[in-house]
Amino acid sequence: MKKTHITEQNFADLGLQPQVIDGLNAKGFIKCTPIQAKALPVLLAGQDIAGQAQTGTGKTLAFLTATFNHLLTTPAPEGRKITQPRAIIMAPTRELAIQIFNDAESLIASTGLKAALAYGGERYEKQQQVIEQGVDILIGTTGRIIDFYKQGHIDFKMIQAVVLDEADRMFDLGFIKDIRFIFRRMPAPTERLNMLFSATLSYRVQELAFEHMQEPEHVVVEPEQKTGHRIKEELFYPSNDHKMALLQTLIEEEWPDRAIIFANTKHKCESVWGHLAADKHRVGLLTGDVPQKKRERILEEFTQGNVDILVATDVAARGLHIPQVTHVFNFDLPNEAEDYVHRIGRTGRAGASGNSISFACEEYAINLPAIEEYIEHSIPQSDYDASALLEDLPAPLRLQRRPQQNRRNNNGQRQGGNRKHSRPRQPRNTQS
């Protein structure tokens, strides 16, 4: 039987509160994805869960639905102040925290529960003002949440529901001490509903679950394969001298509607951005030190189609809901095998097809065996003709001289680049 990304389970048949159903209907959510169909009955019965599912499977909606429903069906603690949150949702990055908040908007509107954001990179006072107006659900990153706690603006004494999203990423980013700090200041695990979600349920993630949860049930949705079957994978072995020219040649051959290019370092991302921007592509840059407001604007432009290509470090690879990405380019093979899956999982989502093109260059080809062992298959290899690569490419822009990019001419047509002509290129020879 062929698996699909939607089940026959209706949200309306799960016994959810009418206000929650209204919020789901407002966004067109009628039937559950597999992780929702498995997790929600467990959570609605009051049982903690440690859920495992790939990015893009609907786990965010699963824990939001359970959280809002739990607060509607559970009386608020006696003596609670409006600045004492009843639920807390922790995410590894501010982008993911913002995305979770945006996904919750229809439930906020339909239930009347108040939510607030807490993350670094934005004015402390602005977030504080929202919290002081009352907060039922606090969504954010651990560092800023702890800042508010230490300043006395919030406490965790009235917490009735907890979500830890992307738990494995929390470990990778070194946030485990912050997580334990917050957990240890909450009511006992038996007095709250606890939800942990992770792409992998490694030993350290399971250890965290059993330390701070009440006998969580494991809910696992295994994919047919670690990389989506709708994603066409392709691998090249370029020399370091050919990498950038090969990337630009492939972009003009593939002409992706919406692409993400991943590199392993901020410096490399800036270099790739500079070459593509000079060639008049509509390209955005997303790295860890880009100011928060600018990051939000870049993501919005990419989502709305005003930017065609996003060059990013792994900060964009986990948790963000960026629809209709047609291509993912691994300019550098990631150092961690799991990150390969998370990167290419940006495409081929919600039943759509996608394309993943990876470079095994002189520097990062050493990572390929571990990646192929992890995904349990070899990535199909393709050759390229070095003499057919684009040569008349403009010098890269420097980041501080970033101009306004426009990838369309006055007639509204997309431009092919900044060259007087393009060299004819031979078709690639794909090997199985």
UniProtKB/Swiss-Prot annotation:
Stretches the record annotates as Disordered: 397-432
Pfam family, one: DEAD
E.C. numbers: 3.6.4.13
GO cellular component terms attached to this protein's record: cytosol
Cysteines joined through disulfide linkages: none
Compositional bias (Basic residues): 417-426
Keywords: ATP-binding, Cytoplasm, Helicase, Hydrolase, Nucleotide-binding, RNA-binding
Top EC class, one word: hydrolase
Residues where ATP binds: A53, Q54, T55, G56, T57, G58, K59, T60
Helicase C-terminal domain segment(s): 245-390
One BP annotation, GO: RNA catabolic process
Coiled coil: none
Domain of life: Bacteria
CDD domains recorded: DEADc (cd00268), SF2_C_DEAD (cd18787)
Motif (Q motif): 9-37
GO molecular function, one term: ATP binding
Keyword Coiled coil part of the UniProt annotation: no
UniProt xrefs under HAMAP family: DEAD_helicase_RhlB
PANTHER family xrefs: ATP-DEPENDENT RNA HELICASE RHLB, ATP-DEPENDENT RNA HELICASE RHLE-RELATED
Biological role stated in the UniProt entry: DEAD-box RNA helicase involved in RNA degradation. Has RNA-dependent ATPase activity and unwinds double-stranded RNA.
Subunit structure, as described in the record: Component of the RNA degradosome, which is a multiprotein complex involved in RNA processing and mRNA degradation.
Family recorded in the similarity comment: Belongs to the DEAD box helicase family. RhlB subfamily.
Protein name stated in the entry: ATP-dependent RNA helicase RhlB
